[in-house]
UniProtKB/Swiss-Prot annotation:
Family: Belongs to the UPF0145 family.
HAMAP family on file: UPF0145
Matching SUPFAM superfamilies: YbjQ-like
PANTHER family: UPF0145 PROTEIN YBJQ
Organism: Listeria grayi
Full protein name: UPF0145 protein
Family matches, as InterPro entries: UPF0145_dom_sf, UPF0145_YbjQ-like
Amino acid sequence: MITTTSPTIEGKQIIEYKKIVFGEVITGINVLKDIGAGIRNFFGGRSGGYEEELIQAREAAIEEMENRAEALGANAIIAVDVDYEVLGADNGMLMVSVSGTAVVVE
């Protein structure tokens, strides 16, 4: 499955547009990671725990979107957009949503 943020794929011709496809993941943020991130934030470092959580959530959302495109008979997704949102009363949830246009290319 070709997945790109571009509206076209160089060297490929789009022969059919299927529909817009989405992938969403909502994950809780671990309390221990919060404590570690707070300490690193205080001292000016990066939070590896949060970064790993973000990477995993993004990859899962993209995989979900690709599975939905494949179910439509698409072999590529163009114009992919990735959005992040912090949710919950205490900002304890992370939502990653991705969208793109499922297409068939030669």
